[in-house]
């Protein structure tokens, strides 16, 4: 690859200078470890300003951990988690959700990465049957792994259905900042206010060096999460360096600047490539992901200059 820039993933980008500065600023003196420091408490309060004063906030190292441990907190081993077949928890987490929760994933094929109430109904036939797993969680990703967005009404409909059937709604928000920017809504509007119970809040895909947060909107669901996080090897001894990044990201509008720029660049890329001969977009670009079908013959030459992920 000749170019320093590529099109593979937001994970390939560097760290925002303001985030690096926040890490450096936190790198002074001795403070208590394991989250008992002023930086972690400050970051938790920043989250609560976005989501509500009784929000439970727990920092972890990565998105897979946020999803796997968040789902563990909400389930028993005889439960199941309903998700789209394209969901990150289903195809890109090496079975971590199943390992930690002990639950089965019930994946549903969708044309656009989005679940609907009608699709969810198709896997509820075994409820109450002791021979079958019992669905407890519906997990959606916003934006989805195909770059599509749930509307606010779609999220509310799934949440209402989940709660009517004694289930909870989990949202994988690895790119939640991009979703908020694209929807032009505050975080709480399409999460807590819409009926989401547990949220994985992503940071690394929006300018952080590393770090995600598991966010609980029902305090009872977080009752044992400190133990689950420790057992899951996600209790950072020097947690201030995760927390300080989130404070820098979320205290002002840095998160929004980053997300808007990423979304805008994705839109520009889609606009430029879609007019090329033999190229068409697989999904409408709604956030910061572009999935395009391009002629097989040109892929090797493109990869010599720019990294991207060839799909099927």
PLM features per residue range, with description:
Residues 104-105, 169-171, 281, 308:
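Hydrophobic beta-strand scaffold residues
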Residues 16-63, 85-86, 90-91, 96:
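Conserved N-terminal alpha-helix of the aminotransferase class I/II PLP-enzyme fold
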Residues 74-135:
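PLP-dependent aminotransferase-like
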Residues 137-139, 149, 186-277, 281-287:
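Active-site C-terminal subdomain of aminotransferase-like
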Residues 7, 47, 66, 97, ...:
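Buried hydrophobic positions in well-ordered alpha/beta secondary-structure cores of metabolic enzymes
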Residues 151-160, 164, 175-198:
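Active-site pre-lysine segment of PLP-dependent enzymes
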């Amino acid at each position: 690859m000749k170019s320093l820039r590529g099109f593979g993933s937001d994970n390939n980008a560097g760290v925002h200078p303001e985030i690096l500065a926040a890490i450096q600023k936190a790198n002074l003196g001795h403070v208590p470890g394991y989250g008992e420091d002023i930086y972690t408490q400050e970051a938790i309060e920043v989250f609560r300003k976005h989501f509500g004063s009784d929000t439970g906030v727990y920092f972890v190292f990565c998105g897979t951990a946020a999803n796997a441990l968040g789902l563990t907190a909400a389930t028993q081993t005889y439960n199941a988690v309903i998700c789209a077949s394209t969901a990150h928890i289903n195809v890109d987490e090496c079975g971590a959700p199943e390992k930690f929760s002990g639950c089965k994933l019930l994946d549903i094929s969708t044309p656009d990465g989005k679940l609907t109430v009608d699709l969810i109904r198709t896997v509820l036939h075994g409820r109450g049957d002791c021979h079958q797993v019992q669905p407890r969680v519906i997990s959606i990703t916003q934006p989805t792994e195909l770059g599509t967005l749930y509307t606010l009404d779609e999220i509310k409909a799934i949440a209402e259905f989940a709660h009517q059937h004694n289930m909870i709604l989990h949202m994988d928000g690895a790119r939640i900042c991009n979703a908020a920017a694209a929807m032009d809504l505050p975080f709480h509007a399409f999460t807590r206010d819409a009926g989401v119970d547990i949220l994985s809040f992503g940071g690394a895909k929006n300018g952080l060096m590393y770090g995600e947060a598991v966010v609980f909107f029902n305090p009872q669901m977080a009752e044992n999460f400190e133990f689950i996080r420790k057992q899951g090897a996600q209790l950072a001894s020097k947690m201030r360096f995760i927390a300080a990044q989130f404070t820098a990201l979320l205290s002002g509008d840095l998160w929004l600047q980053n997300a808007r720029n990423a979304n805008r660049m994705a839109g520009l890329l889609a606009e430029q490539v879609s007019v090329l001969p033999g190229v068409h977009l697989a999904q409408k670009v709604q956030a910061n992901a572009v999935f395009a079908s391009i002629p097989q013959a040109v892929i090797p030459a493109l990869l010599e200059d720019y990294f991207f992920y060839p799909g099927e």
